[in-house]
Amino acid sequence: MNPSEQNHLSVEKPSQTSSGPYTSPPPIGYPTRDAMVGDPPAAAVETKSKGDGFWKGCCAAICCCCVLDACF
C-alpha cells in the first residue's frame, strides 16, 4: 500500500466551552468555604492538654523499641 493512499483520520479537539471535569458535592455536614445564610456561628473549640501521661507513654514506647532492637 502506498503511504499516500492511506486513509487519514482527523481528530477534533474537545470544545473549550466546558467548565472542567465534574466534581461531586461534599458530603452533608462537611464544612465549606462559603458560609450559608442562617448558619449559626462556629463555636470556639476547646483543646485539652494531653498531660504528663502522654509523654511518659511515648518515652516508654521508644525505650521498648530500643530494647527490642538490642535484643533481636
Swiss-Prot record:
* Tissues showing expression: Mostly expressed in roots and flowers and, to a lower extent, in stems, siliques and leaves.
Transmembrane domains' residue ranges: 49-65
Q: Does the keyword Transmembrane helix apply?
A: yes
Task: Mention any one GO cellular component term assigned to this protein in its UniProt record.
Answer: cytoplasm
| Coiled coil regions in record | none
Q: Does the keyword Transmembrane helix apply?
A: yes
**Membrane-topology annotation of the record:** Single-pass membrane protein
Induction / repression: Induced by heat in shoots. Repressed in roots in response to drought, oxidation stress and salt.
Task: Mention any Pfam family matching this sequence.
Answer: CYSTM
Region listing for Disordered, in residue ranges: 1-46
Q: Where is the composition biased (Polar residues)?
A: 1-22
Where in or outside the cell is it found?
Cell membrane; Nucleus
Q: Which InterPro entries match?
A: CYSTM_dom, WIH1-like
Q: Keywords in UniProt for this one? A: Cell membrane, Membrane, Nucleus, Transmembrane, Transmembrane helix
UniProt family annotation: Belongs to the CYSTM1 family.
Which function does this protein serve?
Involved in resistance to abiotic stress.
Subunit structure, interactors included: Heterodimers. Interacts with WIH1/CYSTM13.
> How is this protein named in the record?
Protein CYSTEINE-RICH TRANSMEMBRANE MODULE 9
Question: What gene name is listed for this protein?
Answer: CYSTM9
